[in-house]
Amino acid sequence: MNISIITFTENGTKLAEKIRQAFVGTKMEEAKKLGLSLSDWTRQQFAEKNAIVVIGACGIAVRMIAPFVSDKLSDSPVVVADEAGMFVIPLLSGHMGGANELAEQIAGQIGGIPVITTATDVNHTFSVDLFAKKCGLSIYN
């Protein structure tokens, strides 16, 4: 999985560096140094199927990704972390895209709390989509 991290503050950049060190090949970009609009950057990440880690507010992440969200089978996984690294939230494509697992991995690396909200996970029940993914089966939306 290719991971792209975007930050908006100095503290966010410091946290992104911790994450980047734990995940080989991760691209880290500061919003103010992008060289293109945030919308164009986000479009590019979705086109390349990169996982997106936003260090900042969930509201910013939602506004960034809204025009590009399509369906659970093709969306890029999106994870949000607050700049203090306290909470790591899979926002989009939790099961099929791997955002839940990525959030847990990131939280483990930075000492944060993964905030997993998918019903099958919080209720510890069987997940058809995770089963299909693990078995290499296809799901049609």
Regions found by a protein language model. Give the residues of each.
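N-terminal loops that bind phosphate or other acidic moieties
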Residues: 3, 7, 77, 87, ...
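Short glycine/serine/threonine-rich phosphate/pyrophosphate-binding segments
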Residues: 12-15, 60-64, 99
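Internal alpha/beta core interface subdomains
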Residues: 97-141
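N-terminal basic/disordered segments at the start of proteins
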Residues: 1-28
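Short, acidic/small-residue loops that bind anionic groups at enzyme active sites
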Residues: 69-94, 101-117
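General beta-strand structural signal in soluble alpha/beta enzymes
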Residues: 27-32, 53-56, 80-81, 114-118
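A short, well-structured beta->alpha microelement
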Residues: 26-44, 139
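Short, structured active-site "lid" loops
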Residues: 41-61
